[in-house]
Amino acid sequence: MKSTLFSVAKETLQGVFHAHNWGQEFSEDLLETLIEEARINLNRKARLCLHPNPNEPLQVTYLAFSSPYSDRIHKHPHRPEVLVPIFGQAKHTTFDNAAVAVSSKIIDGRLPIAISTPKGVWHAIEVITPSFVMIEIGTGPFLKDSTVFLQNS
């Protein structure tokens, strides 16, 4: 499976692939390949970034998750984030500063309606189905402080 990803992307971290260039064509089994990669990764997640590197001003990423998976509560202090579910289901929850849930919504690939999270809002996803794939859209560059995790969450 990785050989398919390596033909179109470079693995920059375990389970994180960046396309060789914008406009790259991907095979029809892309989602299956990413889901399989998520199953074998210790963090239960795999990413294919359509942007060739983290410095790009536009960041578009396919993210695949394998159950059981739950994000740590986090926020993006410098940018909003848009998620589009394309396969499976997950629960998207926003939180206050005390890690108390403020809102929660099921996002479903059968109804691929985008959900946006404003910059600075604590949030997380929890995968409900055996696998879940979404597209994440944000602005770059992606820096060390682009994602901040809530302490004790």
Task: State each model region's role.
Residues 66-68, 107-130, 137:
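Conserved metal-binding segment of the jelly-roll/cupin
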Residues 98-101, 105, 124-153:
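Double-stranded beta-helix
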Residues 78, 95-113:
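Extended, positively charged loop/linker patches that create polyanion-binding surfaces
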Residues 62-63, 74-75, 80-85, 114-115, ...:
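His/acidic/aromatic-lined binding-pocket segments of jelly-roll/cupin-type domains
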Residues 67, 77-97:
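Glycine- and acidic-residue-biased ligand/ion/polar-headgroup-sensing regions
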Residues 55-70:
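Conserved double-stranded beta-helix
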Residues 55-56, 78, 130:
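Short strand-connecting beta-turns/loops that link adjacent beta-strands
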Residues 1-57, 103-108:
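A short, N-terminal "cap"/entry segment at the start of jelly-roll beta-barrel domains
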